[in-house]
Swiss-Prot record:
Key word Secreted present: no
Protein name according to UniProt: Phosphatidylglycerol--prolipoprotein diacylglyceryl transferase
Function statement: Catalyzes the transfer of the diacylglyceryl group from phosphatidylglycerol to the sulfhydryl group of the N-terminal cysteine of a prolipoprotein, the first step in the formation of mature lipoproteins.
Membrane-protein topology: Multi-pass membrane protein
GO annotation terms (biological process): lipoprotein biosynthetic process
Residues annotated as transmembrane: 29-49, 64-84, 100-120, 124-144, 180-200, 209-229, 248-268
Compartmental location: Cell inner membrane
Taxonomic source organism: Erythrobacter litoralis (strain HTCC2594)
Protein encoded by which gene: lgt
Length: 281
């Protein structure tokens, strides 16, 4: 009985498919995750700006929807090439987004640049706009990590835990942490709960920077923890061996520090017109 209980779970036996065959083309779940995540974020942002104190109008939300989508795609890809695959620089392969390879940290930079542009053009308080966008990012984070799991990619390090899995794309075919699910839980569900609670049930949105600061600390902290379970990219194994931390962890440390600085600034800065009670949902 003990031997049977310790047998790893075979991903291939879960009946998962990386896409939906529509006949004329296959809709991959990773693409679907991006689409659904963006639509959910857009819908919820529309609900948020109808509540008292919103820093933007619907027209600004429409602009953010467009430019942040571009920021995620281009920032994520450029960040991946710069941080993880500099060997692709100067080649056509650096533009092949459909072959996979997106950087979380690059996507964050792309979104921040998009927010700065829209805020500058619309004369908006960019820090408050960041707050509103940050609340909605976990929708996409959760769906994206679940898509990674459905694709059987970005699996974790070898382990003997009872829920360990063997993924078909693993050349070593050893039991590993399903780290995609850990990330979906921490970066997605947990951060979703924290950000929605802070926005709808507290006065955090009336203090510019609190929400985006908490989000930055939480998402980077979750990534830092998850990296202990996630298998490092083969071409970056030397970073882990030489420093004890992965590339993702080194990139997360400055994000945590920036998030802390933003929260401290937001809480110590005097605000005007803060209401007695937060608006209800």
């Amino acid at each position: 009985m003990a031997d049977a209980a310790s047998q790893p779970i075979y991903w291939s036996e879960l009946g998962l498919s990386p896409g939906i065959d529509l006949g004329f083309f296959t809709l991959r779940f990773y693409s679907l995750a991006y689409i659904v995540g963006i639509v959910l974020a857009y819908w919820h942002l529309g609900k948020m700006i109808k509540a008292p104190g919103a820093p933007m109008a619907q027209s600004h939300a429409d602009d953010l929807f467009f430019y942040c989508t571009l920021g995620v795609i281009f920032g994520g890809r450029i960040g991946y090439v710069l941080f993880y695959r500099p060997d692709l620089l100067g080649t056509l392969d650096m533009f092949k987004v459909w072959e996979g390879g997106m950087s979380f940290h690059g996507g964050v930079i792309g979104v921040v640049l998009a927010i700065l542009f829209v805020s500058w053009r619309g004369k908006l308080n960019w820090l408050r706009v960041c707050d509103y966008i940050a609340v909605n990012v976990p929708f996409g984070m959760f769906l994206g990590r679940m898509a990674n799991f459905v694709n059987g990619e970005l699996y974790g390090r070898p382990t003997d835990v009872s829920w360990a899995m063997i993924f078909p794309t693993d050349p070593d075919q050893v039991a590993r942490h399903p780290s995609q699910l850990y990330q979906a839980g921490l970066e997605g569900l947990l951060m979703m709960a924290v950000m929605l609670l802070l926005f709808w049930q507290t006065r955090a949105r009336w203090r510019p920077g609190v929400l985006v600061g908490v989000f930055t600390i939480g998402i980077a902290g979750a990534r830092f923890v998850n990296e202990f379970f996630r298998a490092p990219d083969a071409h970056l194994a030397d970073v882990v061996r030489d420093t004890g931390l992965s590339q993702g962890q080194w990139l997360s440390i400055p994000m945590i520090l920036v998030g802390l600085a933003v929260v401290v600034y937001a809480l110590t800065r005097k605000t005007k017109g803060t209401p007695e009670k937060p608006a209800s949902a």
